[in-house]
């Protein structure tokens, strides 16, 4: 109920025209008197209305009447600032907007003569309308300030990037050089190891061929005594039976398989020699040489 008492209290109005007349008398306006006067601003914006700035309120009424003419009282829109006869004070911009909103709300069908203060109490949505315009006007200003601050920062970062780029490129080149040198050393080590392993394998192969360390047995030629005994048996009989082969293997200290293989090789050698001798005899008889 305290708010209603504040609305209904006629003694707390901010009108100072009757007590201290400073400017010329204001001509009647097309707007209702309670909206045109500064008392509306003080009623809705009581905490924001400066108590000691009565002279500024009077000068604002004088400027609006002298700047726009004494016959009519038109209201300029205070969104961007810099209009004719408007003062760059935030409270007055709100007042000009309240004039426009009140003109739309209360003068739709024509001017209403002298409504009482209780008429404002019937419309509780009016205070919200007075508080909404400042947010809309202040947000673009803050957005522009944020953009202005971001632009120097971005330009500074753009200036720092070219200076930082050479250092990063040098660091990358040095790291690449180190990596390449490490790769080269690893390749040389691998080549040396491969060469050493190749030499080792060659020596091992020769040693294996001589010592028969691999799965294959060492090539061991027959001794003179063994070859002599086998040659005697071959002259008597080119083909051996199983019993005779076992007897010869025991006498010569060889296995049955070794004796068998030796006789096979000896027969192939004899066949080759007889073929060569036959060809030689034929050529000598016909005199081709």
UniProtKB/Swiss-Prot annotation:
Gene Ontology CC, one term: nucleus
Q: Where in the cell is it found?
A: Nucleus
Where are the annotated segments for Disordered? Answer: 103-218
Q: For bias kind Low complexity, which ranges apply?
A: 132-143
> Any S-S bridges, and between which cysteines?
none
Question: Residues annotated as DNA-binding region?
Answer: 215-274
Question: Where does the UniProt entry say this protein principally localizes?
Answer: nucleus
Keywords, in A-Z order: Developmental protein, DNA-binding, Homeobox, Nucleus, Transcription, Transcription regulation
**CDD domains, alphabetically?**
homeodomain (cd00086)
Q: What's a single GO MF annotation on this record?
A: DNA-binding transcription factor activity, RNA polymerase II-specific
- SUPFAM superfamilies the UniProt entry points to: Homeodomain-like (SSF46689)
Classification via Pfam families: Homeodomain (PF00046)
Start-end of Basic and acidic residues biased regions:
187-203
- Polar residues composition bias: residue spans: 103-117
Function in brief: Sequence-specific transcription factor which is part of a developmental regulatory system that provides cells with specific positional identities on the anterior-posterior axis.
Question: What is the similarity comment for this entry?
Answer: Belongs to the Abd-B homeobox family.
What PANTHER family is this protein classified in?
Answer: HOMEOBOX PROTEIN ABDOMINAL-B, HOMEOBOX PROTEIN HOX-A10
What is the protein's name according to its record? Answer: Homeobox protein Hox-A10
Supply the source organism for this entry.
Morone saxatilis (Striped bass)
């Amino acid at each position: 109920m305290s708010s209603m008492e504040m609305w209904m209290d006629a003694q707390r109005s901010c009108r100072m025209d009757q007590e201290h007349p400073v400017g010329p008398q204001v001509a009647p306006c097309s707007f209702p008197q309670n909206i045109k006067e500064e008392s509306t601003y003080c009623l809705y914006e009581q905490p924001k209305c400066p108590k000691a700035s009565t002279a500024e309120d009077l000068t604002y009424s004088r400027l609006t009447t002298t700047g726009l003419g004494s016959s009519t009282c038109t209201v300029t829109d205070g969104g961007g600032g810099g209009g004719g006869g408007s003062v760059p004070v935030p409270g007055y911009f709100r007042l000009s907007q309240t004039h426009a909103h009140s003109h739309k709300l209360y003068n739709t069908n024509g001017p209403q003569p002298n409504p009482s203060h209780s008429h404002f109490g019937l419309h509780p949505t009016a205070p919200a309308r007075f508080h909404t315009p400042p947010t809309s006007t202040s947000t673009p200003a803050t957005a522009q300030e944020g953009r202005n601050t971001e632009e120097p920062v971005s330009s500074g970062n753009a200036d720092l990037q070219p200076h930082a780029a050479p250092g990063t490129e040098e660091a990358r080149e040095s790291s690449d050089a180190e990596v390449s040198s490490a790769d080269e050393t690893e390749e040389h080590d691998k080549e040396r190891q491969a060469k050493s392993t190749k030499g080792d394998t060659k020596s091992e192969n020769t040693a294996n061929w001589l010592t028969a360390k691999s799965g294959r047995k060492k090539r061991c030629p027959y001794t003179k005594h063994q070859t002599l005994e086998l040659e005697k048996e071959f002259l008597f009989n080119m083909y051996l039976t199983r019993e005779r082969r076992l007897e010869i293997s025991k006498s010569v200290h060889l296995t049955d398989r070794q004796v068998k293989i030796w006789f096979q090789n000896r027969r192939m050698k004899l066949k080759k020699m007889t073929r060569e001798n036959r060809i030689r005899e034929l050529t000598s008889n016909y005199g081709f040489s």
